[in-house]
Curated annotation (Swiss-Prot):
Residues found modified as N-acetylserine: 2
Entry protein name: 2-iminobutanoate/2-iminopropanoate deaminase
Role played: Catalyzes the hydrolytic deamination of enamine/imine intermediates that form during the course of normal metabolism. May facilitate the release of ammonia from these potentially toxic reactive metabolites, reducing their impact on cellular components. It may act on enamine/imine intermediates formed by several types of pyridoxal-5'-phosphate-dependent dehydratases including L-threonine dehydratase.
Family note: Belongs to the RutC family.
EC top class, as a word: hydrolase
PANTHER family named in the record: 2-IMINOBUTANOATE/2-IMINOPROPANOATE DEAMINASE RIDA, 2-IMINOBUTANOATE_2-IMINOPROPANOATE DEAMINASE
One GO-annotated biological process of the protein: lipid metabolic process
Key words of the record: Acetylation, Cytoplasm, Hydrolase, Lipid metabolism, Mitochondrion, Nucleus, Peroxisome, Phosphoprotein, RNA-binding
Length: 137
């Protein structure tokens, strides 16, 4: 049996990890993207403007990590959205639809007690490298 390859994905175009974890890990063709806050990669600080701007930045960060792995948002098969306030669900959905426009990935959304750096939204994703064909069952 051949062993699977595990590769760390990293880019300066997304914020550096703020703890002992990688931006993303690639195993075989599956990319596990760590939760992204609405942090500006240059400053390491949350972007101003509230949950909408934080969601845009978090998804932009995910997009940069996907690019570093040779992928884009069409490769995402699962996302998890963590919200400091579940009342922001609709506002974040409006932003989310700007990045995922068709063949939406599976997703879960949860309200949590708190997020790092006082963030209002954190998004993580799982993607699969390579061309994907969408088929209906």
């Amino acid at each position: 049996m051949s062993s699977l390859v595990r590769r760390i994905i990293s880019t300066a175009k997304a914020p550096a990890a703020i703890g002992p974890y990688s931006q993303a890990v690639l195993v075989d063709r599956t990319i596990y993207i760590s939760g992204q806050l609405g942090m500006d990669p240059a400053s390491g600080q949350l972007v101003p403007g509230g949950v909408v701007e934080e969601a845009k930045q978090a998804l932009t960060n995910i997009g940069e990590i996907l690019k570093a792995a040779g992928c884009d948002f069409t490769n995402v098969v699962k996302a998890t959205v963590l919200l400091a306030d579940i009342n922001d669900f609709s506002a974040v959905n409006d932003v989310y639809k700007q990045y995922f426009q068709s063949s939406f990935p599976a997703r879960a959304a949860y309200q949590v007690a708190a997020l790092p750096k006082g963030g209002r939204v954190e998004i993580e994703a799982i993607a699969v490298q390579g061309p994907l064909t969408t088929a209906s069952l």
